[in-house]
From Swiss-Prot:
The latent-HcTyr1 form contains a C-terminal lid-domain (LID), which is hampering substrate accessibility to the active site. Its cofactor is Cu(2+). SUPFAM superfamilies: Di-copper centre-containing domain. The lineage of its organism: Bacteria, Pseudomonadati, Pseudomonadota, Gammaproteobacteria, Oceanospirillales. It catalyses: L-tyrosine + O2 = L-dopaquinone + H2O; 2 L-tyrosine + O2 = 2 L-dopa; 2 L-dopa + O2 = 2 L-dopaquinone + 2 H2O. This is Tyrosinase HcTyr1.
């Protein structure tokens, strides 16, 4: 059984060999399934200008049309219950290809892909220095000043941030969900029920946070599905997401879907020798089935009871028109459904359990390299976003693809669902609490580039039916 290790606990030359393998794989032709470029294109490939910034560096560029149309490129699964198993398969075959390249260069026979556990920033048992270190892209991957000379191939141009925002790596909204999926498109750990979905609309909580938000925080190639896998840190990021799935599954009351529509779905890749292979979701339901485990790391399990399944809910209020997101937006008033006409209230639940309240951000369209967006909710006039009314953050990973009608997408944009029950419960303690006076605020974490456009179709607030 192989063991994938925490990158900050490595005591060997794992990253040195990784850098050498990346260099070797970059030297291979883009039409070679074992090349760095082909492996990146499995996740996503495009020829619009911002993507070509990275793709025109590929050996042998442009690829043949036969390669582009082979059915192996642009296969990443997003906004779907296949997100986690597809990326586990993707990492497995990538790791095999890298390990073979390392062996062929005379390296160790047991090389494994490390993981970057940025979630350690939430480990209250860790030292402040270790919490802060966890947020930093490992120094072997270079800095904003350029590559680390000893690991030059682990750097890529245009990364926006080398230190993540702590809010962007919070594992608990996902880890505290009890259900992997549900058929109603409501909040779940692993995503909603779909078919093949290169750009789906049923995003699970783990995909939403930390996955999407880390992508857009680092930005550059990582901020776009059509270039993300060209950044060497992509693979360590996804190893951590893969690890979190395994940690979640080991907790009481959690399980993967049992229906054949999930278990029997198959995807195509290439093995270490560049030969086509097919694998089913049921073959990757645990890491042990693929012959590897992760070293124990935070979080080892949830610290709170699993959230109850999302019950029947009703709209409490919503914005009355679409709106654009700028660098600093004033809070937006929600138009509240008159109390006699709605079946839900923002009141404490009867019988002990707290009511679940969900904030939905729907039909988000746009373009450009967006930064993560912080979300706030308040009941006070002129109250700006602050820690007390912070409810979460979203990353618009795949925004342009989701906004463009195509075979893979209906062009309706991205959708998000955030459980804001805890914040609503806190606000309810205020003397001036008024459930018919609710405002939301969306604030980008950094100044957006001039070519960024973000339009939100609707923000709506949903609560349990009384």
């Amino acid at each position: 059984m192989k063991t994938r290790q925490n990158v900050y606990e490595l005591k060997d030359d794992t990253l040195s060999w990784y850098s050498r393998a990346v260099e070797e794989m970059k030297s291979r032709d883009i039409n070679d399934p074992t090349s760095w470029w082909y492996q990146g294109a499995i996740h996503g490939y495009a020829t619009y200008p911002s993507a070509l910034t990275y793709w025109h560096d590929a050996t042998g560029y442009p690829p043949s049309q036969q390669t582009v149309n082979s059915g192996f490129w642009n296969r990443c699964q997003h906004g779907t219950w296949y997100f986690l198993p597809w990326h586990r398969m993707y990492l497995f075959y990538f790791e095999e290809i890298v390990a073979k390249a390392i062996r062929d260069m005379g390296g160790p026979a047991d090389w494994t892909l490390p993981y970057w556990n940025y979630c350690e920033a939430y480990n209250t048992s860790a030292s402040p220095s270790n919490q802060q270190q966890a947020l930093q892209i490992p120094p072997e991957f270079g800095s904003s000043q350029g590559p680390n000379a000893d690991f030059a191939s682990l750097w890529i141009k245009n990364r926006r941030n080398y230190v993540l925002n702590k809010n962007n790596v919070n594992p608990w909204p996902a880890m505290n969900e009890a259900e992997f999926t549900n058929s109603g498109g409501d909040i779940s750990f692993g995503g909603g029920v779909t078919g093949f979905a290169h750009s789906g609309g049923q995003t699970g909580q783990l995909e939403s946070l930390p996955h999407n938000v880390v992508h857009t925080d680092i930005n550059g190639a990582m901020g776009n599905p059509d270039t993300a896998a060209l950044d060497p840190i992509f693979w360590l990021h996804h190893a951590n997401i893969d690890r979190l799935w395994q940690v979640w599954l080991a907790q009481a009351g959690r399980s993967n879907p049992v229906v054949n529509a999930w278990k029997d779905f198959r995807f195509k890749f290439h093995d270490a020798n560049g030969q086509p292979v097919e694998i089913a979701v049921k073959d990757v339901e645990t890491t042990q089935l693929l012959g590897y485990v992760y070293t124990p790391a935070f979080p080892l399990s949830s610290t709170t009871p699993a959230r109850r399944s999302v019950p029947a809910m009703d709209v409490v209020g919503a914005t009355s028109a679409s709106f654009s997101v700028g660098d600093h937006m004033a809070p937006l008033d929600l138009t509240m459904v008159p109390q006699p006409a709605r079946g839900a209230r923002l009141l404490a639940a009867r019988g002990g359990d707290e009511k679940r309240t969900i904030l939905r951000i729907s039909n988000v369209k746009g373009k450009g390299a967006t930064s993560p967006i912080d979300l706030f909710i308040t009941n006070r006039d002129n109250e700006e976003g602050n820690e007390e009314n912070f409810v979460g953050c979203i990353g618009l990973f795949g925004l342009e693809n989701a906004s463009t009608p195509s075979v893979e997408s209906d062009g309706s944009g991205l959708n998000f669902a955030i459980d804001i029950s805890d914040t609503i419960n806190k606000l309810r303690q205020r003397d001036d609490w008024d459930e018919d006076n609710i405002r939301v605020q969306l604030i980008p974490q950094s100044k957006q580039d001039s070519d960024v456009e973000i339009n939100v179709g609707r923000v709506s607030l949903h609560s349990e039916i009384d």
